[in-house]
Curated annotation (Swiss-Prot):
NDH-1 is composed of at least 11 different subunits. Keywords: Membrane, NAD, NADP, Plastoquinone, Quinone, Thylakoid, Translocase, Transmembrane, Transmembrane helix. GO terms for cellular component: plasma membrane-derived thylakoid membrane. It comes from the Bacteria. The keyword Acyltransferase does not apply. InterPro entries: NADH_UbQ_OxRdtase_su1/FPO, NADH_UbQ_OxRdtase_su1_CS. Signal peptide: none annotated. PANTHER family: NADH DEHYDROGENASE SUBUNIT 1, NADH-UBIQUINONE OXIDOREDUCTASE CHAIN 1. It catalyses: a plastoquinone + NADH + (n+1) H(+)(in) = a plastoquinol + NAD(+) + n H(+)(out); a plastoquinone + NADPH + (n+1) H(+)(in) = a plastoquinol + NADP(+) + n H(+)(out). This is NAD(P)H-quinone oxidoreductase subunit 1. GO terms for biological process: aerobic respiration; photosynthesis, light reaction.
Amino acid sequence: MNSGIDLQRTFIQALVDLGLSSEIAKTLWLPFPMLLMIVVATVGVLVTVWLERKISAAAQQRIGPEFMGPLGTLAPLADGLKLLFKEDVVPAKADPLLFTLGPVIVAVPVFLSYLVVPFGQNLVITDLGVAIFLWIALSSIQPIGLLMSGYASNNKYSLLGGLRAAAQSISYEIPLALAVLAVAMMSNSLSTIDIVEQQSSYGILGWNIWRQPLGFIIFWIAVLAECERLPFDLPEAEEELVAGYQTEYTGMKFALYYLASYVNLVLSSLLVAVLYLGGWESPLPVELISNWFGVSETTPWLQITNATLGIIMTLLKTYLLVFIAVLLRWTLPRVRIDQLLDLGWKFLLPVALVNLLLTAALKLTFPFAFGG
């Protein structure tokens, strides 16, 4: 396990230095990860919603949000406030308990996944040794909430949307997990920190996208399907199902689905950046930069600069992938449900299995290049 920045230890030690007891410091830490996670995820969503509106407008030769704040940057905030004050309506024949639990079960695992994703040089809330497995386990809870919402709404369109969403999620969960296993096999670890560190040796040439091109394509297609982005937005196909499992939702319950969708998109882009694009690593290795300037890697100003650049690089890679996902929305037509399931079960799953076996063979044959 890499011994980098530990937010928990640093936070508790800072409070102890201020004169608080260790027990009180640990108690004060308990709500901190959740608050930090919610703030980071919410800010990421606001930026993503604004980007989607502006990119969509550009694709359609419109201006987009312009007058709500500078360049319309306050438009996403206005959307959120509008939903906050909307009436929360529960259909007369719906199951009130399941109807309320559905959005919560969908939203909570997405937020919890941010606990194990690094935003910079070892800057992670919880550096778990099984971080990737935890994320896969959390993401597999979502279909239960989607089915619950579709069933509890007592609406045929909602039920069909929930069934489609569950089928889609299950179909693409397996290829996604196999693609991640190939990366974990090369990195000899399931920790997100260790996976990024393993890509740090040769700059851009050391990133996993070059050693796992098939895995990268499989993972990117699978996360787009998991996020229900076009061309895989069949659970919400307006022409067929009105709004799918969200049809009967209003107010804050609908806002939870809206929020979870964009939080999941940012999270998926972050994970692609971490697993395949070197995370916080810059295209040029730090060793090369320090040699150019003739300074030691342990020089404080170089370490601070490198840590700051790491956060910037992570966000740049993440929002580049968000940009591509938004652009795909206006580029590709929606696939049919049979095409969607055929792609997952008959193409991505066999290719993901072949990719995993190929990775194992290359790891044994060329251990230096494939993390042996």
